[in-house]
């Protein structure tokens, strides 16, 4: 039996429309979907990737940013390995709101989670409202990793996940500890997307 690698749960958080789904889609399928459709509830996809000769099984949990779905979020944060907090660099308010998302993650997971702050939509050069320095400073303030991306342009998507797997490699404590946790995932109560549980494999060459 081949090396299945350790499993890690990545939960994507942030306001509606910041590009969480687009980042995941670009990583999963290498393309940008021009047809915007808001995530309903929670979406879940799985991808196996390799980093420095190690295999990582990533569960990507895409959460809805709408207020009416906020009550679903804490239960998905609770057993996460990584929280990816996304904002739109062309929306100052979405950046301001990342503080609340980070605080919610800390309330549920304390220090037992890797937080990554991601400024998406860097292709909107003329509409930028949040500088790189502001993003870096906030990440430093909250002890988070930081990266800017553009799912539309495919910019920094692979490097983002390479950074995440690199951080996971240095923090074994955040991986699932039980083998059954890798397969026994009950999605039925809160799963609404028809894309749920797609699985792919890739190599992360950084």
Curated annotation (Swiss-Prot):
Keywords: ER-Golgi transport, Golgi apparatus, GTP-binding, Lipoprotein, Membrane, Methylation, Nucleotide-binding, Prenylation, Protein transport, Transport. The modification Cysteine methyl ester is found at residue 206. GO terms for molecular function: GTP binding; GTPase activity. It is found in: Golgi apparatus membrane. One of its GO terms (cellular component) is Golgi membrane. It comes from the Eukaryota. It is a lipid-anchor. The keyword ATP-binding does not apply. A lipid is attached at residues 204, 206 (S-geranylgeranyl cysteine). InterPro entries: P-loop_NTPase, Rab, Small_GTP-bd, Small_GTPase. GTP binds at residues 14-21, 62-66, 120-123, 150-151. A motif (Effector region) lies at residues 36-44. The keyword GTP-binding applies. GO terms for biological process: protein transport; vesicle-mediated transport. Its main location: Golgi. PANTHER family: RAS-RELATED PROTEIN RAB. Belongs to the small GTPase superfamily. Rab family. Protein transport. Regulator of membrane traffic from the Golgi apparatus towards the endoplasmic reticulum (ER). NCBIfam families: small_GTP (TIGR00231). This is Ras-related protein RABH1a. It comes from Arabidopsis thaliana (Mouse-ear cress).
